[in-house]
Every structure is written in structure tokens, then in C-alpha cells.
């Protein structure tokens, strides 16, 4: 009994499988192989179609109008930028030359006004209220074009001319005002060969009811008194 019991237990516990094991492995390998073939075929088909579409889009000619439009806009914007930079450079150069150049109207005006303010005779003609504590400050401005009292709306009148030697002459006119009187200042400056600043060659002040006062008198060139026929002296030279 003891020997037959374990055999029966073994018979009951261990049952043979209905299908052999090698069949399951074969079936699984076949399924995986067919699925891989399907995925490869699907991928190859889609890749071919996408490649054909890309080739068509690449080979398709682009329209000409957008290219012309983009090129024209780029050229126009470049011209605008270059023109704006050029105009800005010219304006900056003119402003700097006018304000800081020794031959500019601003520098000439400041020099002339300082000369008028320091002159005692002109201050007496203008009846300035000068005392021990201080001196009256004069107002200097340009032409009275409008009735506006603001000095910034009164521009300075100035002109430039070239002489026979090719040097520039500056002509300027402005007003000087005290509390009691107003004077008109005339200035003539000439380009200097030695200095950066033009030389004042003529400057005078006109006060209403007073005689003209010269701060700088012009140099008169002597005229040779030539006697003789056709302005030529005939005969021996007299030493």
C-alpha cells in the first residue's frame, strides 16, 4: 500500500498537456513574423508616398511676384534708412559748426556783445544804471520781425561774401537794449590768415539821438594820386 500510494498521487497531480509545447513556440514565432512583415510593408508604402509628395513640392516653381515684392520692400527700406542717416549727419554737422565753429554766427555774436558790454562810452550812451554794487546787464537780440517780446523769435541778420583774395567777410547786425535806450550794432569781420577766429575790421553802434560811435574803425587804403597822361607819370623818376 505504501508503495502504490505515491504512484497514484503522482498520477493524479501530473497531467500531460493537451498540446505539445513546441507547437506554442512555433505559433508565436509565425505570428510575430507576419506582424513584422505587415509593419514593414506599411512603412515602405507610406514612406514612398511621402517622398513623392516632397519631391513634387520641391520641384514646384515658386511664383515670381512675392520675390519681387520682398526685394522691392527691402530696397525701399534700405534707401529710407540711408537717407535718414545722411540727413541726420548733415543736420548735426550744421548745428555743431554753427554753435562751436569760431567763424559761426553764434561765436561772432557772443564776441561782439561782450565788447559792447565792456565799453564804458557805449554804456554811457545807453544810460545804463551802473553803480558801486553792480552794473546793468544789457539785452542783445536780432531783428524785430514780430511784436513778440521773446528774444528767441528775433533772429540775427548775417551775410557772408568773398573778396578778391578769396577770404570770407562776415556782416552782422543786432540790437543792444538797456532799460532806457536801444542801440543798433553793425559788425564786419574778415577771415584771418593767422587765427582761427575772424578778425573784426569794422564795428560801430548807432544810438537814436546820439552820434555814431566806432568801436573798431575800418582801415582806409590810401589812393595814389597819379598825375599824367592815362594815369602814368612820364619822365624821370624822382627819388
UniProtKB/Swiss-Prot annotation:
InterPro entries: Tim21, Tim21_IMS_sf
GO biological process, one term: protein insertion into mitochondrial inner membrane
Mitochondrial intermembrane side: 97-239
Record's bilayer topology term: Single-pass membrane protein
Cellular compartments annotated: Mitochondrion inner membrane
Mitochondrial matrix side: 71-75
Cellular component GO terms held in the UniProt record: mitochondrial inner membrane; mitochondrion; TIM23 mitochondrial import inner membrane translocase complex
Transmembrane segments: 76-96
Gene3D superfamilies on file: Mitochondrial import inner membrane translocase subunit Tim21
Pfam families found in the cross-reference section: TIM21 (PF08294)
Note: Present with 3770 molecules/cell in log phase SD medium.
SUBUNIT field: Component of the TIM23 complex, at least composed of TIM23, TIM17, TIM50 and TIM21. Interacts directly with TIM23. Interacts with TOM22 component of the TOM complex. Released from the TOM23 complex by the PAM complex, leading to protein translocation into the mitochondrial matrix.
Purpose of the protein: Essential component of the TIM23 complex, a complex that mediates the translocation of transit peptide-containing proteins across the mitochondrial inner membrane. Required to keep the TOM and the TIM23 complexes in close contact. At some point, it is released from the TOM23 complex to allow protein translocation into the mitochondrial matrix. In the complex, it acts as an antagonist of TIM50 by reducing preprotein accumulation at the TOM23 complex and promotes dissociation of the PAM complex from the TIM23 complex.
PANTHER family for the chain: MITOCHONDRIAL IMPORT INNER MEMBRANE TRANSLOCASE SUBUNIT TIM21
Name of this chain's protein: Mitochondrial import inner membrane translocase subunit TIM21
Gene: TIM21
Amino acid at each position: 500500500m505504501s508503495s502504490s500510494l505515491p504512484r497514484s498521487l503522482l498520477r493524479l497531480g501530473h497531467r500531460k498537456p493537451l498540446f505539445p509545447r513546441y507547437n506554442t513556440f512555433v505559433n508565436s514565432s509565425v505570428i510575430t513574423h507576419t506582424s513584422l512583415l505587415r509593419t514593414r510593408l506599411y512603412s515602405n508604402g507610406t514612406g514612398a508616398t511621402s517622398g513623392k509628395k516632397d519631391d513634387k513640392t520641391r520641384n514646384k516653381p515658386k511664383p515670381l511676384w512675392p520675390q519681387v515684392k520682398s526685394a522691392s520692400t527691402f530696397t525701399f527700406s534700405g534707401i529710407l534708412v540711408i537717407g535718414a542717416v545722411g540727413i541726420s549727419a548733415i543736420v548735426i554737422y550744421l548745428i555743431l559748426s554753427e554753435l562751436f565753429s569760431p567763424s559761426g554766427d553764434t561765436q561772432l555774436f557772443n564776441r561782439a556783445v561782450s565788447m559792447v558790454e565792456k565799453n564804458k562810452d557805449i554804456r554811457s550812451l545807453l544810460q545804463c544804471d551802473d553803480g558801486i554794487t553792480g552794473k546793468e546787464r544789457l539785452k542783445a537780440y536780432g531783428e524785430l520781425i514780430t511784436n513778440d517780446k521773446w528774444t528767441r523769435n528775433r533772429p540775427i541778420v548775417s551775410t557772408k561774401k568773398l573778396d578778391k583774395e578769396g577770404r570770407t567777410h562776415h556782416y552782422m547786425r543786432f540790437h543792444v537794449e538797456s532799460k532806457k535806450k536801444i542801440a543798433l550794432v553793425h559788425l564786419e569781420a574778415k577771415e584771418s590768415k593767422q587765427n582761427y577766429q575772424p578778425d573784426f575790421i569794422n564795428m560801430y553802434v548807432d544810438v537814436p539821438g546820439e552820434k555814431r560811435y566806432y568801436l573798431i574803425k575800418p582801415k582806409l587804403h590810401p589812393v595814389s594820386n597819379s598825375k599824367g597822361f592815362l594815369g602814368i607819370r612820364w619822365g624821370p623818376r624822382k627819388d
